[in-house]
A protein has these predicted regions:
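Acetyl-CoA-dependent GNAT
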Residues: 3-21, 25-117, 126-128, 132, ...
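A generic structural signal for beta-strand entry/edge sites
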Residues: 102-104, 140, 180
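Short loop/turn motifs at secondary-structure junctions
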Residues: 106, 137-139, 160
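Conserved catalytic-core motifs of GNAT/GCN5-like acyltransferases
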Residues: 142-146, 157, 162-180
Length: 188
């Protein structure tokens, strides 16, 4: 099953599960937990501008945007990753369905609190996400990784994002230069 280019993209369900995790749409009461998770990952900012300091209001706006059912924002979804055993939010991601192409999904961020990294929650989330998106008829997931963010490169490549679609960035290397690659994982 594939989607017609003229049909709106199908969206992830508001709640789904993996063996150890519950993934569900972010809600306003989750914002302070999401902000704490993001802030705990600020150590990555020197390698990846995505992790620069973000005000709490910006995360609240992303949660609100994720709850929109009209306009182009309906394609955007922020979901919290919770441990089944405790119910604690350990990470989150946001994606855009049908972007940048109709049969793809763009992952704009996937982040786990450092206390919950190296427990295979990221792999479990990505494997579950791939299963969900494949069932909805998507063909691929795209994302961007900063080349200075070696832990992220290892994570994404180790999780099947091995096709380089595009290089972005400066042509010469300096301490402040920017470079990133767009990666793809086929779902079929």
């Amino acid at each position: 099953m594939t989607q017609s280019d003229h049909t709106p993209p199908l969206l992830l369900p508001p709640r789904w599960e993996t063996a150890r995790l519950v993934i569900e749409d972010g809600r306003s009461p989750d914002v302070s937990s999401l902000h704490a998770i993001f802030s705990a990952c600020a150590y990555v900012a020197p390698w990846d501008d995505t992790f620069r300091e973000v005000p709490l209001a910006d995360l609240a706006a992303l949660v609100n945007r994720s709850q929109t059912a009209v306009g182009e924002d309906y394609r955007f979804k922020l979901q919290c990753v919770r441990e089944k055993a405790t119910g604690e939010i350990v990470g989150y991601f946001h994606i855009s369905h049908g972007a940048p192409e109709p049969h793809t999904v763009w992952v704009s961020i996937l982040v786990f609190h450092p206390d919950f990294q190296k427990q295979q929650y990221g792999r479990e989330t990505i494997d579950g996400l791939c299963d969900q998106l494949l069932a909805l008829g998507y063909e691929a997931i795209w994302l961007k990784v900063y080349l200075k963010n070696w832990p992220a490169l290892r994570f994404w490549i180790g999780n099947g994002f091995t096709t380089i679609l595009k290089y972005e960035g400066d042509k010469t290397m300096t301490p402040t230069s920017y470079a990133a690659i767009r990666l793809e994982r086929k779902l079929r």
